[in-house]
A protein has these predicted regions:
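Sec-dependent N-terminal signal peptides
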Residues: 6-15
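Bacterial Sec-dependent signal peptides at the C-terminal "C-region" and cleavage site
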Residues: 14-25
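A short helix->beta-strand "capping" segment at the edge of beta-propeller domains
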Residues: 23-40, 70-75
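Beta-strand-rich domains and repeat architectures in extracellular enzymes and scaffolds
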Residues: 32-64, 79-91
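Short coil/turn segments that connect the beta-strands within blades of beta-propeller domains
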Residues: 50-51, 94-95, 134-135
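Conserved beta-strand positions in repeat-built beta-propeller and related beta-rich domains
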Residues: 55-59, 97-104, 139-140
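Short loop/turn segments that connect beta-strands within beta-propeller blades
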Residues: 69-73, 111-115
């Protein structure tokens, strides 16, 4: 009786395992173009806004926010952060640039056009990803 139960359980588990894996789709990718990038930049946030590429980079001692020339990979403009901050996600909403930090739990606000510092505030958790739906900020 015990052996029969074990056999039934094993058969059911194998059936479930097979049905779970049967529906997995595989996708391929094709690289159509490559662009240069600063290999020393530890990318945390990356977005396009009005045809311009922006990147926030994080590392204690070398965090920055950059407006990037896509063709060369060079920073057209750059904001460096105090070495105590590990910068994470960033996004522009309206005329303001929002930048989160990781363990410091600080959010920065800059003028999006000039990259001039406006303010900072305490953020209630670790900052990670940041995006927008065009009306409000969305953080992970």
């Amino acid at each position: 009786m015990l052996m029969r139960r074990i056999t039934i359980i094993v058969i059911l588990m194998l059936g479930l395992l097979q049905s779970c894996c049967a529906g997995v789709r595989k996708y391929g990718v094709e690289v159509v173009k490559e662009y240069p990038h600063d290999s020393g930049a530890y990318t945390q946030g990356l977005f396009f806004q009005d045809g311009q590429l922006y990147e926030s980079t994080g590392q204690y001692g070398s965090s920055s926010f950059r407006k990037i020339d896509l063709a060369t990979g060079k920073a057209l403009e750059k904001v460096d952060f105090n070495r105590k901050y590990f910068v994470e996600g960033s996004v522009i909403l309206g005329d303001e640039l929002f930048i989160l930090t990781w363990e410091s739990r600080v959010a920065f606000i800059y003028d999006a056009a000039t990259l001039s510092y406006k303010s900072s505030y305490s953020y209630p958790r670790e900052g990670w990803g940041l995006t927008t739906d065009g009306k409000q900020l969305i953080a992970s």
